[in-house]
Regions:
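Primarily residues marking transmembrane-helix entry/exit sites
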Residues: 3, 7, 109-114, 127, ...
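Hydrophobic alpha-helical transmembrane segments in multi-pass integral membrane proteins
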Residues: 55-59, 123-129, 197-210
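Juxtamembrane helix-boundary/capping and inter-helix hinge elements in multi-pass membrane proteins
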Residues: 32-39, 108-109, 181-184
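Flexible cytoplasmic inter-helical loops of multi-pass small-molecule transporters
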Residues: 93-110
């Protein structure tokens, strides 16, 4: 099992990432605004299945990588820091958009909603990068099975992502209406997320390998 500090640290990173606008959030909000909160939740089920798929693939891959390549930890650490900096730039760059500035989508059946949610997540390269580059930062080979730690941390990320996205999907209509007349709030949201992610990136880059 991961150490308590690793669990809390990864939970904090996961929370910061799920609050950062991305393809999944934009799709879920668009779907909720178009068809209602229930449709957003069904779509979220497909997104969650995509998380499980990536978690299992990454868990086995991370296990093999950390055991086979001595410098894998540092390589993944810097890749993870770079990924967070890229997300921070996406949040604050000129012309950036809030996820609540969304397009209308066609009305679809529950089955199609689920499948589209799954495909949206599966085709999102940022999710693969999240598991490949960020998960290893919180794994300590001396704390037990690397595979077990990977699965536990992945499950935490999925639980946080599903919980937060469910609340966002259910409240999407009200939030979008609130922000539509308050553009300054959208700007504050983008800069807040960008600052948090940049801070996490710097911390990750300078953090020494656990022994």
């Amino acid at each position: 099992m991961p150490h308590t500090s690793a669990l809390l640290g990864f939970a904090l990173v996961s929370l910061g990432l799920v609050l950062t606008p991305g393809p999944n959030m934009i799709y879920l909000i668009s779907r909720s605004i178009t068809q209602g909160g229930a449709a957003g939740i069904v779509s979220l089920g497909g997104v969650a299945l995509g998380f499980v798929f990536y978690m299992l693939c990454a868990a086995f891959g991370i296990t093999a990588l950390l055991l086979a390549i001595p410098f894998a930890y540092d390589a993944l650490r810097f890749a993870g820091a770079g990924y967070l900096l890229w997300l921070a730039w996406q949040a604050v760059k000129p012309g950036g958009r809030s996820p609540f500035q969304v397009r209308k989508l066609a009305v679809d059946s529950p089955r199609k909603l689920f499948v589209m949610g799954f495909i949206t997540n599966l085709l999102n390269p940022k999710i693969a990068m999240l598991y490949l580059a960020l998960l290893p930062q919180f794994i300590d080979p001396t704390a037990g099975s690397v595979l077990t730690q990977s699965v536990v941390l992945g499950a935490i990320q999925i639980a946080i992502s599903v919980s937060v996205n469910a609340m966002i999907a259910l409240a999407a209509g009200s939030i979008a209406l609130f922000l539509a007349n308050r553009p300054s709030w959208m700007l504050v949201q983008r800069w807040l997320m960008g600052t948090v992610l940049a801070g996490l990136a710097v911390r990750m880059a300078v953090e020494a390998k656990r022994v």
